[in-house]
């Protein structure tokens, strides 16, 4: 997560989104993910949503994420977005269709009430899901027509894989697969490839994340 945030700080075009057929660039970086309150089929989910900037480091991010997860797992706490959805699905079908159409109309124009979406991960710069935490490998998640999210990252389960060397030999190392889905309209392939190179550099050299995220990195 820290590596992704630093990528967005150093490569601001990754923080763009499309709304109403126009391109916008956020003035903040937000990260969101779903938190399971308990590891049980019947358990509810909470929405974690945090903002970060160039002055943050991996240490400040780690502290804030632990605090956010603790709050999300409390049974007596529910975010506004989840609470609204719970009420919405109780409406009669005909009324639900009307409300949903109105919300999509407002979303297209950037007019959805902030209280309804301030914890909605579909409005975050980075939408994360950690499938590795439930024993699954990484994959690719689609982007949604709702919201402004343009970047989805799926984290897979840690597993062993060969790392091949130039002489034909290999070393077996633990690896984690990442599935990245990006809205191709916010940039071009060259810009995306640079972002992936930077992400790889940060993952291979995590000590770089101990400095403020705004600190430049050669890659």
Model region roles, listed by residue range:
Residues 1-219:
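C-terminal catalytic/motor cores of large multi-domain enzyme assemblies
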């Amino acid at each position: 997560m820290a590596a992704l945030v630093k990528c967005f700080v150093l490569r601001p075009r990754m923080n763009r989104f499309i709304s109403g057929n126009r391109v916008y660039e956020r003035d903040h970086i937000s990260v969101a993910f779903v938190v399971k309150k308990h590891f049980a089929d019947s358990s509810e989910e909470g929405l974690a949503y945090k903002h970060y900037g160039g002055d943050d480091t991996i240490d400040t991010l780690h502290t804030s994420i632990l605090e956010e997860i603790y709050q999300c797992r409390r049974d007596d706490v529910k975010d506004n977005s989840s609470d609204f959805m719970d009420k919405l699905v109780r409406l009669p079908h005909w009324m639900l269709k009307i409300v949903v159409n109105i919300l999509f109309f407002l979303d297209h124009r950037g007019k959805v009430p902030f209280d309804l979406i301030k914890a909605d991960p579909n409005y975050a710069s980075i939408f994360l899901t950690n499938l590795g935490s439930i024993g699954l490998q990484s994959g690719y998640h689609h982007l949604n027509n709702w919201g402004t999210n343009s970047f989805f990252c799926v984290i897979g389960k840690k597993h062993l894989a060969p790392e091949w060397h130039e002489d034909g030999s290999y070393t077996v190392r633990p690896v984690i697969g990442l599935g990245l889905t990006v809205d191709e309209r916010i940039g071009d392939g060259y810009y995306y490839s640079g972002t992936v190179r930077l992400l790889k550099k940060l993952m291979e050299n995590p000590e770089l994340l101990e400095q403020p995220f705004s600190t430049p990195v050669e890659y």
